[in-house]
Swiss-Prot record:
Keyword Nuclease tagged: yes
Gene this protein is translated from: rnpA
UniProt-listed Pfam families: Ribonuclease_P
GO biological process: tRNA 5'-leader removal
Protein name listed in UniProt: Ribonuclease P protein component
Keyword Nuclease in record: yes
The species this protein was found in: Buchnera aphidicola subsp. Acyrthosiphon pisum (strain APS)
E.C. no: 3.1.26.5
Key words, A-Z: Endonuclease, Hydrolase, Nuclease, RNA-binding, tRNA processing
Any GO molecular function: 3'-tRNA processing endoribonuclease activity
Biological classification of the source: Bacteria, Pseudomonadati, Pseudomonadota, Gammaproteobacteria, Enterobacterales
Amino acid sequence: MLNYFFKKQLRLSDSTSFQDVFNGSVKKKNTLEISILGRFNLLGHPRLGLSIPRKNIKHAHNRNLIKRLVRETFRLLQYKLLSMDFVVIAKKNILFLNNTRIIDMLNSLWSNYYR
């Protein structure tokens, strides 16, 4: 039975990991609302980092909502994804979408990284 927890080992925790993804991203998928950068790792499981700039999304409750939605879609799809480090970057236009549209868009973006 698969366990769908979002453990600490599935997170990008330090700045060097983020910089490695920003500088050496192999796969980039963009929409007007979100970008996902990906870089292969040797860990055998995917890891997620979030970049939700305060400059783009002013209110903390909106930033937290976006983070929750991204983490939830990642958590549910973690066993389908390639062994990569991902950084998700939110853009201003994401505020104009409702939750179901954001989830659908994230699922379609994650599908580009399936095994």
